[in-house]
């Protein structure tokens, strides 16, 4: 088991607090392993094995049509005697109404509760009803580059060679743990994707025309890091003689978000200081999904690098937007409490770097500004703007 300390550290302040700790992220991102780490942390604090109840709620682990009442009864019957129990409940979204059972357990005062899930419906209005102010959400992502290096301590490859591998193979832990050729790695990722689609989207939402759903997904993946709308997808599909309503496309995008396959990135108007509700971008929960679905192509690199930087900013707790500064675009405006950073991303700086450096120079404030590049020869400082190699950006202690 490779330790992922960031998540354990995120949980530590809330141990023994009357809050449900929710760890949510795409399937196979390592949530169950993080549970094992939390279990070890509890044991180091003196909690006995008999006081830690771990339960999986995947399709293979529980009876079909299990109810919240059955779940509650099963857990309370296992809490024998007085004292506190620690409940680690994995993939809990498979139990309809789980939040009612968890709320009752929490109100009983004897349970410290941790849950994982692979669907953002974990954060539905039902939770607002039953757990208002009584939960903390900890997003779980696939491996950062720093974590990827931890998984590869036995590798003889250089840091930059491992970065190239990370760019091509992504950060699903199961892939990083192996030593796979590209075809095998993408087969694994393709299997993860199709499991998510079949279980969390097609089956759950009763999609009849999977061919249309698959075509919408392909459009989104092909246009990763580009602005588009449901209307523009509909128009494009009409050009292929495929008919689908804009409402259906909105639903498909929402369900992909809920399953953590994609993340939306809204535009932020730096002049008006407001979020724009049109022409957002989408990024994938792991860059390997793009290659698994479309095949590897070095020409995709610009969008892939953007995706990697976007996820790194999200991991660090930033709220990430596309920046609009009059007619100029900034790849990312990232806010975290009273902090802000601006980031442009490119494979290498062109001879005329007006878009990368010039666009940032037009922003007249004191916040840090970066150009992140894959070309080490481009790095340095230009007019106060830090031009940094991708690996250095991903491994930096702070921005």
Question: What is each model feature region?
Answer:
Residues 2-16:
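Pre-Walker A adenine-sensing motif
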Residues 31:
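Conserved lysine of the Walker
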Residues 180-339:
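Accessory nucleic acid-recognition modules appended to NTPase machines
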Residues 23:
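Hydrophobic anchor at the beta1->P-loop junction of P-loop NTPases
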Residues 34, 38:
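Hydrophobic positions on the alpha1 helix immediately C-terminal to the Walker A/P-loop
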Residues 121-137, 152-153:
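Short regulatory helix/loop adjacent to the ATP-binding pocket of P-loop NTPases
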Residues 323-324, 347-391:
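Catalytic cores of nucleic-acid endonucleases
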Residues 53-83:
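Short glycine-rich substrate-engagement loop in P-loop NTPases that contacts/grips substrate
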């Amino acid at each position: 088991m490779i330790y992922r300390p960031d998540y354990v550290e995120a949980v530590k302040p809330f141990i023994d607090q009357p809050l449900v700790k929710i760890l949510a992220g795409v399937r196979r991102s390592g949530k169950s392993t993080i549970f094992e780490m939390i279990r070890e942390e509890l044991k180091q604090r003196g909690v006995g094995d008999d006081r830690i109840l771990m339960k999986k709620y995947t399709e293979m682990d529980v009876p079909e049509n299990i109810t919240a009442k059955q779940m509650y009864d099963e857990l309370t019957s296992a809490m024998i005697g007085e004292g506190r129990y620690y409940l680690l409940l994995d993939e809990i979204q498979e139990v309809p109404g789980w939040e009612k059972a968890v709320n009752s357990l929490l109100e009983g005062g004897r349970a410290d509760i941790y849950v994982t899930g692979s669907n953002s419906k974990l954060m539905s209005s039902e939770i607002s009803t039953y757990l208002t102010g009584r939960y903390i959400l900890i997003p779980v992502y696939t491996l950062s580059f720093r974590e990827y290096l931890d998984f590869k301590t036995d590798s003889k490859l250089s840091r930059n060679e491992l970065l190239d591998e990370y760019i091509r193979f992504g950060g699903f832990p199961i892939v990083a743990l192996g030593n796979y050729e590209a075809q095998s790695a993408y087969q694994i990722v393709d299997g993860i994707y199709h499991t998510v689609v079949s279980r969390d989207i097609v089956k759950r939402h009763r999609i009849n025309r999977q061919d249309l759903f698959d075509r919408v997904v392909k459009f989104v993946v092909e246009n990763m890091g580009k602005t588009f709308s449901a209307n523009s997808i509909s128009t494009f599909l009409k050009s292929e003689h495929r008919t689908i309503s804009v409402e259906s496309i909105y639903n498909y995008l929402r369900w992909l978000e809920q399953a953590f396959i994609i993340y939306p990135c809204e535009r932020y108007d730096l002049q008006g200081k407001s979020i724009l509700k049109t022409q957002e971008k989408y990024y994938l929960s792991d860059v390997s999904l793009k290659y698994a679905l479309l095949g590897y192509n070095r020409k995709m690199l610009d969008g892939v690098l953007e995706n990697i930087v976007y996820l790194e900013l999200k991991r660090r707790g930033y709220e990430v937007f596309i920046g609009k500064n009059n007619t100029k675009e900034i790849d990312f405006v990232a806010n975290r409490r009273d902090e802000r950073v601006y980031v442009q991303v490119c494979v290498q700086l062109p001879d005329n770097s007006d878009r990368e450096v010039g666009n940032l120079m037009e922003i007249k404030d004191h916040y840090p500004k970066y150009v992140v590049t894959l070309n080490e020869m481009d790095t340095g400082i230009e007019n106060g703007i830090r031009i940094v190699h991708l690996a250095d950006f991903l491994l930096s202690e702070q921005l």
